[in-house]
Amino acid sequence: MERLLIVNADDFGLSKGQNYGIIEACRNGIVTSTTALVNGQAIDHAVQLSRDEPSLAIGMYFVLTMGKPLTAMPGLTRDGVLGKWIWQLAEEDALPLEEITQELASQYLRFIELFGRKPTHLDSHHHVHMFPQIFPIVARFAAEEGIALRIDRQPLSNSGDLPANLRSSQGFSSAFYGEEISEALFLQVLDDASHRGDRSLEVMCHPAFIDNTIRQSAYCFPRLTELDVLTSASLKGAIAQRGYRLGSYRDV
């Protein structure tokens, strides 16, 4: 049985080095999809590069933890910027859900303005869309707009029922991440999904060239290792041998 494999590179628009890495991994590797931060400092550069890479499926990376929001969010920002304190607010059940709903709609419209089309799917920076308070908002929005949604099913148990018409991959893995990146690790992710019986799988990745912005990230040099692995000459053949075909959320 042929299985669908979506190799999605996060952080499109974060920096020029990140953008170039994603394009390289698409053009000369196995990356088929990406998610863009519409408030990223290099989003205009990402849009420009994407025009020469029409095969790259582009989704929207909903951002609530970095940079400036597009709408007024006094309940979530500090000094006008977003940050990781969202986790504390979630634990205190103090998230400003109406503000988050408005920001989601604004980022979505901004994506369409930038790229001239709807995103192929939705995802979020640091997976905040999987918070139990936020997930129903994002799932309902994706279903209403007819776009797919990345779902990490491990924390999903307390998030309620899914909308009937919501599209997603059957499996998702964030395991291709960390200090021990290798081709063997990537293939192990596929083998694990096969053993679970997943008919479709999204694998998250972050291929990049190193620039000053990426140097400031806690996850820096492994991004370059990811790029090496994802453009390996042997990897595409090994994927096909395992019964996977490369695709995107357009195929879900």
From Swiss-Prot:
Known role: Involved in the degradation of chitin. ChbG is essential for growth on the acetylated chitooligosaccharides chitobiose and chitotriose but is dispensable for growth on cellobiose and chitosan dimer, the deacetylated form of chitobiose. Deacetylation of chitobiose-6-P and chitotriose-6-P is necessary for both the activation of the chb promoter by the regulatory protein ChbR and the hydrolysis of phosphorylated beta-glucosides by the phospho-beta-glucosidase ChbF.
Record's protein name: Chitooligosaccharide deacetylase
Top class in the EC scheme: hydrolase
Chief location bin: cytoplasm
GO biological processes: chitin catabolic process; diacetylchitobiose catabolic process; polysaccharide catabolic process
Cofactor names: Mg(2+)
Positions bound to Mg(2+): H125
Gene this protein is translated from: chbG
Organism: Shigella sonnei (strain Ss046)
Any one GO molecular-function label of the UniProt entry: metal ion binding
Family label: Belongs to the YdjC deacetylase family. ChbG subfamily.
Swiss-Prot/TrEMBL keywords: Carbohydrate metabolism, Chitin degradation, Cytoplasm, Hydrolase, Magnesium, Metal-binding, Polysaccharide degradation
EC number: 3.5.1.105
PANTHER family: CARBOHYDRATE DEACETYLASE, YDJC DEACETYLASE FAMILY MEMBER
